[in-house]
Amino acid sequence: MSSNLSIDERWKVIEAYFKSKGLVRQHLDSYNDFVRNKLQEIIDEQGEIPTEIPGLKVRLGKIRIGKPRVRESDRGEREISPMEARLRNLTYAAPLWLTMIPVENNIEAEPEEVYIGDLPIMLKSAIDPISQYTLDKLIEIGEDPKDPGGYFIVNGSERVIVTQEDLAPNRVLVDTGKTGSNITHTAKIISSTAGYRVPVTIERLKDGTFHVSFPAVPGKIPFVILMRALGILTDRDIVYAVSLDPEIQNELFPSLEQASSIANVDDALDFIGSRVAIGQKRENRIEKAQQIIDKYFLPHLGTSADDRRKKAYYLAYAISKVIELYLGRREPDDKDHYANKRLRLAGDLFASLFRVAFKAFVKDLTYQLEKSKVRGRKLALKALVRPDIVTERIRHALATGNWVGGRTGVSQLLDRTNWLSMLSHLRRVISSLARGQPNFEARDLHGTQWGRMCPFETPEGPNSGLVKNLALMAQIAVGINEKIVEKTLYEMGVVPVEEVIRRVTEGGEDQNEYLKWSKVILNGRLVGYYRDGEELAKKIRERRRKGEISDEVNVGHIVTDFINEVHVNCDSGRVRRPLIIVSNGNPLVTREDIEKLDSGSITFDDLVRQGKIEYLDAEEEENAYVALEPSDLTPEHTHLEIWSPAILGITASIIPYPEHNQSPRNTYQSAMAKQALGLYAANYQLRTDTRAHLLHYPQRPLVQTRALDIIGYTNRPAGNNAILAVISFTGYNMEDSIIMNRSSVERGMYRSTFFRLYSTEEVKYPGGQEDKIVMPEPGVRGYKGKEYYRLLEDNGVVSPEVEVKGGDVLIGKVSPPRFLQEFKELSPEQAKRDTSIVTRHGEMGIVDLVLITETAEGNKLVKVRVRDLRIPSIGDKFASRHGQKGVIGMLIPQVDMPYTVKGVVPDVILNPHALPSRMTLGQIMEGIAGKYAALSGNIVDATPFYKTPIEQLQNEILKYGYLPDATEVTYDGRTGQKIKSRIYFGVVYYQKLHHMVADKIHARARGPVQILTRQPTEGRAREGGLRFGEMERDCLIGFGTAMLLKDRLLDNSDRTTIYVCDQCGYIGWYDKNKNKYVCPIHGDKSNLFPVTVSYAFKLLIQELMSMIISPRLILEDRVGLSGGKGNE
């Protein structure tokens, strides 16, 4: 049997993978795990609600999640669909019901199911009803049938929880100390458990002593004292706990000497307690120290007194790692290695958020219970519970992105520019590192990111390398309970640490024998020793492939001259990727398997269960020897890549021939693909997005990669196939600008529509006042003038298909006054103010949709969508799929464009200078492939590494009568003369990006000014001016153009006239009664003269006065135009 699986056969495996997994599986899996397991665990952690009242407590039972629904203002409840939530600005959430059992004097009352709050639902997750709907049913409720879900709807807007990248918690990471400090080597452990994280630091000082520090105790605690406090007393026990190796044991002498005065547990605890409970009695100090050690020292190992020995052995293991580093037996741990990274997904983040919300809820309920019991009422739990505590906590965090633990930007608005940008946003990974610091290593592409993170897709600028995207096949472990794995390990013959130490110290066995044994480390914790590490790793893998151990478990065996460790991992957040298992140089996935996959009789998961494909994390991949191609296989290989191009992420996968481009060009294209206009959602006509673009005639690319079908790009494309000529023509395509065929544009090429939403609701205010959506009366404050309201109907709302321009009122609205005193003074009509919604300045369009509905509070909500036709014009931005971006420099009619012998006229003309220095060979190849596709009617495969060879395509176009280099004899359309050299003509996919001149064009003559400085406002949205800055001013000073300088900086900015007293130099004020200016000091006894200054200068003087500095303006005689006395 030939073991060489063809490209097509391996592609079937990929298709099966995505059929069963989809593209946003990682969020859905994580959220489902939260809903099914973590939610109940958080409730069980609390267990019961204790109260101050003797004999009364409330026991907590099972939690149940209802169907998504809304509570209407008339208190009725009904189920809602996601689309209704979007349109009515609701939150798509389901009620949580918790069983509570009041217990009085150990007598249980009837269990009650109590509503405790709302939980936002992730679309398409296990608890979302629409995940079970058929395609027709989805279309019926207004959803895009291909929408992947994975996001939330909060207050009508779609929000994503972005995956967070973190250093792996509960691992010992060793490093060398800073040069020049007293510390030579350090170990850091982020001990993370339900609800809180405690960093523990171990330091080796120059004198050879070891110190431990953690936040709850000020200062550093000597290592031996801490070990004694944890219950390991004798020097011998401490030394053997650290290591069985005499060389390592010797390094502990300085530490043992340092702590020789403290010999028992109580003294050690008192040493710690004297830092925490200063000046208290010895018993209190010891008790406090015990509490702190249990709760705040390595809490992930447990928080009871029974866990102290476990903590001692963990600490000893960390010390042994530091000593090994000091002795040169191991390298410092690589913080950027992906084995030391964990991703926190929606489920983990939601769990930490819900935990905090639930704690607040319990605290409030305890208070309410005590308050009601004191009054001696019968317990009515339903009346005492305040569900809005949980609801609001969670909703606020999702709506703002401010999470517990001080993280910001955790939830973001889903980017719906096009289909690709939405998918890419759902697969984004953010590193929590500060982007202000350089962090060069953290930004670099690390070898362990192969197949896990996309090598191209990262932003330019300060976030470069910190914001990443998952590769196509990356999958994130949900994690399983480590107790199960620990039990299995002991069954397989792993000897626990304590047992080994007992055998050596008391049983008299040879410690050198155990030094040859392998350390077994489970999730970063030393659990025991095993005779042969290689054998153990092999056994675990065999069991996993047989399905006896969960496939979430990964194992790596690390062997160097000094180190022999087996690392077993089963925690959540590890990025893993599937590989085909190879034995004796043959892949275990056979042709028969692939035929079964193709026919649908087995799924991808079945292959994993059968042990033919397995998921490896970065740690286990260190042991794997992976072949890229079946033809590379040798008997030494352990695994085979399923599909090499799957190392790319979603956006980089759509680039044709990416391996022929310079690397940064692919990065630029990955960013621009998210800005291209296309069909962003099939239900766009029902949606009310704040801003949306729609390309009228998107086409699927003629030159495709295989990933396009998986991503769904062929059904929701964003671009057109354009005929491209490469020629320096007219000079209007210099410096990356392009020339476009005006006739093609007039036929509809790259036309798009821009939708903008305007919305408002009738808000009710305290005191019985409310907004009204009506046509405002001419008497109200801020009335704009009759012509602005001309489009409104009787109900105060514009009607559909009406043309509007900047300043026109779309929704008329009046609001009560802001302050009460106005209300008393003015007539009822004047008291109201006009708060109408107007079309943005500088925009125009046609009213597309008017939606009148009401919010959950029962307030009237009006949404108006305005559409604007956008025809490509000079200055609009376009880009090919190879990072070649440019703006239109000129639109030339077809008659003036160059044409070939066959009469073909290009749609786009690109300057040849854009190609050599950028080295985007992919674009030249795409042009040839596109030409073949257009001639033959076949779509060309340009998948990286597995493409149709370009030479083959060149031979093909030769058969159609074209030159293999795709050049053609061309004539100048203006003169009809033949152009001397042959011109390259090809078909290239061009994208229209959302940077359009219509959104950016801006000029101003007169306009609004700022209240404070009376200078023109800034920015296009506020009709602002263009700033004449300091450097521009310097130029004018250099030119000596005094009048121009005065014109820009005074006359056309904030010129104002002030009146200055000729005696004291203060600015006077205008007395209305006397009808003249008076000096604040001399009254009307002095003369005041007008002086022209900048208002900003006047403001500066008055602000100085407020700081008790007294600037005075000294006046001299004004120079007459005919010349003064000669001494001015």
UniProtKB/Swiss-Prot annotation:
GO terms for cellular component: cytoplasm; DNA-directed RNA polymerase complex. GO terms for biological process: DNA-templated transcription. It holds the Pfam family RNA_pol_Rpb2_6. Zn(2+) binds at residues 1061, 1064, 1079, 1082. Its cofactor is Zn(2+). Its EC number is 2.7.7.6. It is found in: Cytoplasm. Keywords: Cytoplasm, DNA-binding, DNA-directed RNA polymerase, Metal-binding, Nucleotidyltransferase, Transcription, Transferase, Zinc. GO terms for molecular function: DNA binding; DNA-directed RNA polymerase activity; ribonucleoside binding; zinc ion binding. It catalyses: RNA(n) + a ribonucleoside 5'-triphosphate = RNA(n+1) + diphosphate. Belongs to the RNA polymerase beta chain family. DNA-dependent RNA polymerase (RNAP) catalyzes the transcription of DNA into RNA using the four ribonucleoside triphosphates as substrates. This subunit is involved in DNA promoter recognition. Part of the 13-subunit RNA polymerase complex. PANTHER family: DNA-DIRECTED RNA POLYMERASE I SUBUNIT 2. This is DNA-directed RNA polymerase subunit Rpo2. It comes from Saccharolobus shibatae (strain ATCC 51178 / DSM 5389 / JCM 8931 / NBRC 15437 / B12) (Sulfolobus shibatae). The lineage of its organism: Archaea, Thermoproteota, Thermoprotei, Sulfolobales, Sulfolobaceae. The gene is rpo2.
